[in-house]
Amino acid sequence: MSYQLLRAFGRRIRWGMVGGGLDSLIGEVHRLSARLDNRFELVAGALSIDPAIAAETAAVCLLDTSRSYTDFREMAERESEREDGVEVVTIATPPHLHAEVSKLFLSKGIDVICEKPLTRTLEEAVELERFVAERPKRLFMVTHCYTGYPLVREARALVRNGALGEVRQVECDFPSGPFMTENSDRNRRHWRFRPEFMGKEAIFGEVGAHTISMAQFVSGKTPIAVSASMSILTEGRETFDDAHLLLRYPGGVLGRMWLSFVAAGNDHGLAFRVYGTKGSLIWRQTEPDTLLLQHVGRPAERLIPGHPDRLTPEGWHACRLREGHPEGYVLAFGNLYRDFADTFFARKLGQTFDERLFRIPTVQDGVHTMRVYEAAAQSNQRSGSWVNL
């Protein structure tokens, strides 16, 4: 692992958070991931709309009380006025706030790391994309976190290097099973089960954002049309909790996705399969250290992380450990933070960098997921008719 850019820059990035209090699982994941490589220092935050949770989280994070805010607008204003103000902010709020918070901090000259989904609607996403494009000096990353796994990046490189021949089929599923019943107290439900946060099709903002981004990341293909069927299988639920998609790609390439919150017995479920003319790739998030490369006419290969001589540069760059030591979710998430930080350093130092290695999901990737989301919603409303993207 190289620390040359960090050493050249001479200090950690001053980092802040909006959302992600102690009552948030993903907030702690962001903090763990950012700390892994010594590139970020948490110096400020509007960590919760609940003042008690915000204060408690700030205390646990050892923040100066003067830099613990209960309003992200006040945080953006005051931090932008400080010589030692935050340089990067992570947005870990529900999606209906992502666009507003992102644009505010970007307008103050602060780079943004945004949780998925990018926004609540496609209209907001396109507007945010335009807003970012008008500020070319700003960095913007969407945390499509599973793209940080070493073997996911290895799969991407293998596809691009022609190991599968011509890609013919792309399949990506996320059938999780922990949400078989609905909370009777509506106010205690997660945003994914409250349509006011992201519509009745919020399953696409949660697990769908991962499958859509993963399919494009690995295959390099962007769908041109989608057919979708969605269902509510849980009594009392207001949002769809199961969805099936068919996708068409340029050149006759086919795709399929299954999203679910009610796949009973599944702890997680994220997996992809890419089939080409010469072979195929299979990967599962619950077994992240195994990538199966299947060939036509000869035995399959089981690829594992930790072998610099057996992996592409892209796959090896994402490895943290030598062979035999499991790589995990937080390490994969941390790869996004590391790549973002090194991109930040390189830009500040006027240095070039290899974008194949420093791969961060951009606002354009976030917009892509929202385009598929909106097309799928329209298709479902039209009884599964094909909708062009």
Task: Kindly give the residue locations of the regions a language model identified.
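Receiver (REC) domain switch-region micro-motif
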Residues: 45, 89, 170
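A structured beta-alpha segment of the ubiquitous adenosine-cofactor-binding alpha/beta core
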Residues: 67-86
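N-terminal Rossmann-like dinucleotide-binding module
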Residues: 1-63
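C-terminal capping/lid region of NAD(P)-dependent oxidoreductase domains
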Residues: 6-10, 138, 165-169, 378-389
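Beta-strand-loop-alpha-helix segment that lines the small-molecule cofactor/substrate pocket
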Residues: 88, 94-147, 162
